[in-house]
Amino acid sequence: VLGSKKVLVSSQDLVTTPSLKIKKKASKNRGLTRVKEGTLNGRQTFGTFVKGASNTLAAIAAERVGENPGKSYNPLFIYGRTGLGKTHLLNAVGNTVYDNNKDYKIRSFSAEHFTNKVISSIRSGKTKELRDSLRFDCDILMVDDIQFISGKEGTQQEFFHTFNALYDANKQIIITSDKPPHQLAGIQERLVGRFEWGFAVEVLPPDVEHRVAILQTKARSLGLSIDEEVLFVIAEKSGGSIRELEGFFNNVVGQASMLGNPINKTLVLDVSSRLLSTKSVDHRTIELIQKETAAFYGTTVQD
């Protein structure tokens, strides 16, 4: 992948501390930034986005859109499984544009929110106001999880005409989805075609080295020094998504902090065992409910 770079953690630089002391570094990032519509997460910037083979192409495309919105890669369509950083890139573009020109009218929301806006405007008789705000008072439209409008014909109709108006005016459109355009079921063919007009790019689950790089960035932000071997164990024991990785890491750090223990292999394995045990209990509980429900109705779980 263009610009991919394998990042490893040097054990010479990282030493396991006997006791955990989290030193939160002063962040230069703002919190939530209110834009024309919606908010931007100030912590999700290109500076905090860790590139790897799985996401470099998407990151480069997003960076270029952030520097020159409406000039290239329009629309920018980022797709991939949940928890891989699509929303982070969406916010990073918005933050870059906002920092460069605060006069830009940025509208950022989920596809579910867009659907609710359409329904609300119909009920209140303010459809024209909605259309005018989206089509003529917007420089950048960012919509997260577009797959949500699947099967919603009225919402798709509004989005189709909004897309056309913004595209014709050279306004930037950025969309995220869990699938590539051609695999979106229940979406009008004419919309799918427009999603493919620009640049569609996938983000994939990070490999082990990439996950370690993400963990190192996380650890540094907390002022922690963690041995390379321990980081690899965390990377291997966590799930495939960045969200799962960060969740597992937070559990490790949290347990170490509460018990006053160092972050080492033993602690990581203990956390892994605890989390797997919880999942196992949840799974057994679901099975029990299914069996009892089936017995009550005189049927089987398979039925």
Q: Each predicted region: which residue ranges?
A:
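C-terminal helical "lid" of AAA+/P-loop NTPase domains
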Residues: Q216-R220, E229-K237, R243-M258
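Short regulatory helix/loop adjacent to the ATP-binding pocket of P-loop NTPases
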Residues: I119-R123, P181-W197
